[in-house]
A protein has these predicted regions:
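Family-specific signature for flavin-dependent thymidylate synthase
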Residues: 1-268
């Protein structure tokens, strides 16, 4: 089958309203730099597969965020917005630290020796430094008596026994706390998401989200996705776009009134 024959066949199916065959064609998009506000809207399109960056197990040192154009173009609004984002991160860090210390004490993570070895993390470098206090320096000291040697041996036995246990408990505790403190993050928080949709679902997605009445961020995403699929599969997507591209605008009195402009923009 030539490309021309395939194009005619797909167009004939589309003109008959017979779209089920194109459900066998799927497209995958890797999307980044978008807000969680966008992804909340995106997953309403249910006949699709999504894999989104998780906030559940990874502590974010400084979250990235999306700034809406209307805010970015206003100096005072932009300043207030950035301040709110920084305050959200500060609250995240403070609550995380507080809950971590509280939970660590409750679980007894910091035992007799590990509390001395580490102030915050389980750093083996600190353990080495303890040994250096015995035998290093300008005038290395020889261990003076058997009691000191026994203390040193006891330290290593305790260290070898407690460190793995504490590391496991510490890691588990971190994950539990992150699950709670992530509630602080706003919808503006930047995320990454992988999307797979079949061609029929994409056409429906474009009908709703390429419309000028769609929210600006998801509209920008839909327009870019539409542009990309038109390049690789013009036979399927030559008439893809908002509803008004191939028919009357369904928005009624809420219509943007730009049917002509929209058709010029989307029709190949």
């Amino acid at each position: 089958v030539t490309d021309e024959e395939a194009y005619k066949f797909v167009n004939r199916l589309a003109s008959m309203g017979h779209e089920s065959p194109i459900e066998h064609v799927s497209f995958t998009f890797a999307v980044e730099g978008v807000s969680r506000s966008l992804t909340h809207q995106l997953v309403r399109h249910r006949i699709a597969s999504y894999s989104q960056q998780s906030q559940r197990y990874v502590k974010i040192a400084q979250f990235e965020y999306v700034v809406p154009p209307a805010i970015a173009n206003d100096v005072i609004a932009s300043k207030l917005y950035i301040q709110a984002m920084e305050e959200a991160q500060e609250a995240y860090n403070n609550i995380y630290d507080r809950l971590l210390v509280k939970k660590a004490i409750e679980l007894g993570i910091y035992s007799k020796y590990t509390a001395y070895i580490n102030e915050k993390l389980f750093d083996k470098f600190r353990a080495t430094k303890i040994i250096e206090t015995y035998n290093c320096g300008e005038n290395p000291e020889v261990i003076k008596n058997e009691s000191e040697l026994m203390t040193l041996d006891e330290f290593w036995r305790e260290y070898d026994k407690e460190l793995p246990r504490n590391e496991r408990m510490y890691s588990k505790t971190q994950k539990t706390i992150i699950e709670d403190v992530r509630y602080i993050y706003p919808n503006a928080c930047e995320t990454k998401i992988c999307i797979t949709m079949n061609a029929r679902t994409l056409l429906n997605f474009f009908h709703h989200r390429c419309c000028d009445r769609a929210q600006w961020e998801i509209r920008e995403l839909a327009n870019e996705m539409c542009r990309l699929v038109k390049e690789v599969a013009p036979a399927i997507f030559s008439k893809a776009g908002p509803n008004c591209v191939c028919g009357p605008c369904p928005e009624g009195v809420m219509s943007c009134g730009k049917v002509k402009e929209m058709r010029e923009k989307f029709l190949i």
